C-alpha cells in the first residue's frame, strides 16, 4: 500500500480551497498560517507548544491581525482594479459593521488602516455608536449609523458630526426621520441623512430573508415617497446624500447581487432626476466567505464569485447607469464585515478521549448454546456479500429489534444483548464499507454511515465558541493540526463538554464521502491531539453564550515581525468566578458559605482539619481558574487505541 503523504491530507481536508492564501500543511505534517503575502509561515504546533510554556491553556482563540490588514488591502486593490477598468471617477469606501466582531483589538486593527484604505465603521445600536465614537478615527473616516434609533442615539450622532466626525444617520423607519428632523432643527445642525431602501430583490443562502419585500428594515417605495415629502417640508432635501440597501449576509449567488444593483441604481437615477444630491450609494454587506472551499452557491456555505467579481459588478453598475443617463458617478460604500474578519481567527482545542460502537471479531467465540438470534447475526456477519447486502441488512436489523424486545421482557440476559450489539454494529460497518463502493446507494444504506463514526470528546463549548454551528448549521472548516503526514484511520464526530446532546459538530466539509464525519487519527497517551476550527472571526465570539457556564476562551494575538512570529498579547479567558458573577453568584459570599460548612463538618468530626483546609484551598483555586478542563501532569483522559476500519 502506498505511504500516506501530506498531499493526501491537503486533498482530504480541501485546505487549498477554503484556506487559499492563508492556510496550508508543511512537510512535517503540521498546519501552518501565512498571515502576510510572501511572509513566513507559522507552524501551529510550535506556536501551541510555546503557549503551553506560557501557561496558556486550551481551548484558545488564535488571532492574526496581519490577516485583517491583508483582507483590507485585498478588497482595496480590487476597487482600484475595477475603477481603472471601468473608468470610475468617484471614491470607494470600506465600512466595517462592528456587530460582526466588536472586540476592541479587532476594530482597532481595522481602523488603523482608515487613512490608507478609506476604512470606516458602522454602528447598529447605541452601545456600538458609543464604542465607535471612542476610537481614534481619521477625521475623514466614514461612520454609518444604522439600526433602530431613539432621541439620545440621534442626538449623540449629531453632536459628533458637529465636532467634525463624518457621520451619516441612515433612516430605517419613518419615525426616525421625524425625530431626526426635529432634533436637527432644535440643535441647529444640518445632518448627513441616508435612507435605507427596502428592495424587492433578496439575497441567497441562510440570510436570504434579510432582504426583499418582507425584510425587517428599510423604507418601501411608498414610504420613501412619504420621506421625500417630509424632507421637503422640513427643508432638509440638501441633507439627503446617501441611499443604502442590504439584501442579507453571506450572499451565495452573484446573480442576486447583480439584480439588487440594477434595482438600486434605478432608485439613484430617479432620486437624482427629482433634484436630490445623492452622493453615496451604500450597497451594504453580503460579500461572502468560501467556508467549504467549493466556490458554489449550491451548498449554502460558499459563494460562486470572487471579491474582484463582486467589486466589478458594483462599480460597473454605477458607471453604466450614470453613462446611460448622463449623471454624476456616486461614491460607493460596501459594509463588508464577514469577508474582512472571518479568516483571521482559529479556534483550537484538544480531543480528550473517544468512544466507539462495539465490535465483533474472530477472537470472540459463539457457544453452541448461544441464543438463536446471536447465531443468526453471526451467520449474517460471516457470510455477508455485496449481491445480497440489502436483504442481509434487513435481516440484521430485524434480529437486533427482536433481541431488544426480548431483553425488555426479561427473556434475554445481558451477555446475550452485548453479543447482539457487537455483531450488529460489525455487520453495519461491513455493510457500509461494501455500500460505499456502489454508485447508486439506496437511502437506507446511506444513513448507516451517520451512525458509525467514533465520538471524540473535545475541550470546548460549541455554544460559546461556534454558536452558528448549532443555531443555523453553519459549516466551518475543521481539521487536525498535526500528524497530517499520517493517514487518518478513524472517522469521528466532535462532542463538546457541555451537558447538552446538541453540543457536537457532526456536519463537515463534504469531501471524499465525509460529510457527516471527520477523518482523524487514533489518540495516543500523553500526546495532545489538536483540532482547529477555521474562519471563525466573524460573529462567533460575540454571539457565543454561556451554556453550562463555560465562558470566553483564552485569546492570543500573533503578528509577523522581522520575518518571524511574535506573541503580541494574551487575553485570559473568563474564570469560574467571573461567569458566576453574570448569574448573580458573588464569589466572596460563596467562599464564606463554604468556610462555614467546612468548619461545621470539622467540628462534627466528619472530616479532619487537614481535609477541610485542602477542600477550601481546592475550592478557591477552582473558583479563580479557567472554566474549561485543564491538564494535570500533562495528561487528559486520552487512550491509545486503533480505529475499526
Each predicted region: which residue ranges?
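Flexible, glycine/charged-enriched surface loops at secondary-structure junctions
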Residues: 58, 62, 84-89, 274-278, ...
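Active-site-proximal beta-alpha core segment in soluble small-molecule metabolic enzymes
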Residues: 87-280, 289-293, 304-309, 317, ...
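Short, glycine-/Ser/Thr-/acidic-enriched flexible segments
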Residues: 30, 38, 67, 101-103, ...
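Conserved, well-structured core domains of diverse proteins
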Residues: 1-57, 559, 566, 576-577, ...
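Low-complexity, highly charged intrinsically disordered N-terminal segments
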Residues: 20, 25-102
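A non-catalytic, amphipathic alpha-helix used as a structural packing/dimerization or gating element
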Residues: 66-74, 226, 263, 313
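Charged (often Lys/Glu-rich) extended helix/loop segments that serve as interaction or gating elements
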Residues: 4, 305, 313-315, 319-645
Amino acid at each position: 500500500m502506498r505511504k500516506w503523504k501530506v498531499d493526501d491530507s491537503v486533498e482530504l481536508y480541501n485546505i487549498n480551497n477554503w484556506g487559499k492564501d492563508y492556510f496550508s500543511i508543511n512537510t512535517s505534517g503540521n498546519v501552518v498560517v501565512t498571515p502576510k503575502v510572501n511572509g513566513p509561515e507559522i507552524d501551529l504546533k510550535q506556536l501551541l507548544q510555546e503557549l503551553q510554556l506560557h501557561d496558556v491553556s486550551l481551548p484558545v482563540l488564535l488571532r492574526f491581525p496581519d490577516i485583517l490588514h491583508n483582507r483590507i488591502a485585498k478588497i482595496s486593490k480590487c476597487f482600484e482594479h475595477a475603477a481603472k477598468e471601468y473608468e470610475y471617477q468617484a471614491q470607494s469606501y470600506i465600512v466595517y459593521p462592528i456587530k460582526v466582531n466588536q472586540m476592541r483589538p479587532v476594530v482597532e486593527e481595522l481602523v488603523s488602516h482608515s487613512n490608507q484604505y478609506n476604512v470606516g465603521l458602522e454602528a447598529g445600536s447605541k452601545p456600538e455608536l458609543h464604542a465607535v465614537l471612542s476610537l481614534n478615527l481619521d477625521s475623514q473616516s466614514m461612520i454609518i449609523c444604522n439600526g433602530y434609533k431613539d432621541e439620545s442615539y440621534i442626538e449623540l450622532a449629531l453632536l459628533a458630526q458637529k465636532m467634525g466626525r463624518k457621520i451619516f444617520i441612515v433612516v430605517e423607519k419613518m419615525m426616525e426621520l421625524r425625530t431626526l428632523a426635529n432634533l436637527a432643527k432644535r440643535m441647529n445642525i444640518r445632518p448627513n441623512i441616508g435612507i435605507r431602501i427596502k428592495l424587492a430583490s433578496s439575497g441567497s443562502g441562510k440570510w436570504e430573508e434579510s432582504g426583499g419585500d418582507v425584510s425587517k428594515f428599510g423604507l418601501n417605495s411608498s414610504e420613501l415617497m412619504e420621506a421625500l415629502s417630509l424632507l421637503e417640508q422640513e427643508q432638509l432635501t440638501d441633507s439627503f446624500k446617501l441611499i443604502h440597501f442590504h439584501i442579507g449576509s453571506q450572499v451565495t449567488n452573484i446573480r442576486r447581487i447583480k439584480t439588487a444593483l440594477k434595482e438600486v441604481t434605478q432608485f439613484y437615477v430617479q432620486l437624482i432626476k427629482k433634484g436630490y444630491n445623492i452622493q453615496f450609494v451604500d450597497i451594504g454587506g453580503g460579500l461572502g466567505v468560501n467556508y467549504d472551499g467549493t466556490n458554489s452557491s449550491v451548498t449554502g456555505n460558499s459563494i460562486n464569485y470572487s471579491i474582484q467579481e463582486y467589486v466589478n459588478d458594483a462599480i460597473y453598475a454605477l458607471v453604466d447607469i450614470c453613462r446611460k443617463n448622463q449623471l454624476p458617478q456616486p461614491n460607493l460604500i460596501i459594509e463588508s464585515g464577514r469577508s474582512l474578519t472571518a479568516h483571521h481567527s482559529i479556534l483550537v482545542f484538544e480531543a480528550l478521549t473517544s468512544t466507539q460502537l462495539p465490535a465483533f471479531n474472530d477472537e470472540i467465540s459463539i457457544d453452541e448454546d448461544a441464543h438463536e438470534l446471536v447465531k443468526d447475526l453471526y451467520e449474517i456477519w460471516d457470510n455477508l456479500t455485496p449481491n445480497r447486502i440489502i436483504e442481509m441488512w434487513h435481516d440484521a436489523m430485524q434480529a437486533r429489534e427482536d433481541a431488544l424486545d426480548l431483553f425488555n421482557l426479561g427473556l434475554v440476559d445481558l451477555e446475550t444483548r452485548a453479543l447482539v450489539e457487537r455483531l450488529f454494529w460489525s455487520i453495519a460497518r461491513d455493510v457500509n464499507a461494501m455500500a460505499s463502493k456502489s454508485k447508486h446507494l439506496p437511502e437506507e444504506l446511506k444513513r448507516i454511515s451517520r451512525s458509525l463514526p467514533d465520538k471524540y470528546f473535545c475541550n470546548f463549548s460549541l455554544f460559546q465558541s461556534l454558536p452558528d454551528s448549532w443555531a443555523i448549521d453553519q459549516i466551518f472548516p475543521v481539521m487536525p493540526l498535526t500528524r497530517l503526514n499520517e493517514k487518518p484511520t478513524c472517522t469521528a464526530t466532535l462532542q463538546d463538554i457541555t451537558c447538552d446532546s446538541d453540543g457536537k459538530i457532526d456536519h463537515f466539509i463534504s469531501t471524499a464521502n465525509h460529510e457527516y464525519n471527520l477523518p482523524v487519527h487514533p489518540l495516543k497517551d500523553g500526546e495532545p491531539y489538536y483540532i482547529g476550527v477555521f474562519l471563525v472571526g466573524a460573529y462567533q465570539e460575540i454571539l457565543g453564550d454561556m451554556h453550562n457556564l463555560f465562558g470566553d476562551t483564552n485569546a492570543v494575538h500573533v503578528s509577523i515581525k522581522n520575518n518571524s512570529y511574535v506573541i503580541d498579547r494574551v487575553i485570559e479567558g473568563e474564570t469560574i468566578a467571573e461567569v458566576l458573577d453574570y448569574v448573580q453568584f458573588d464569589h466572596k459570599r460563596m467562599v464564606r458559605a463554604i468556610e462555614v460548612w467546612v468548619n461545621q463538618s470539622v467540628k462534627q468530626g466528619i472530616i479532619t482539619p487537614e481535609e477541610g483546609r485542602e477542600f477550601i484551598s481546592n475550592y478557591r483555586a477552582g473558583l479563580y481558574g479557567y472554566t474549561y478542563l485543564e491538564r494535570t501532569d500533562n495528561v487528559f483522559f486520552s487512550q491509545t487505541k486503533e480505529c475499526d476500519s
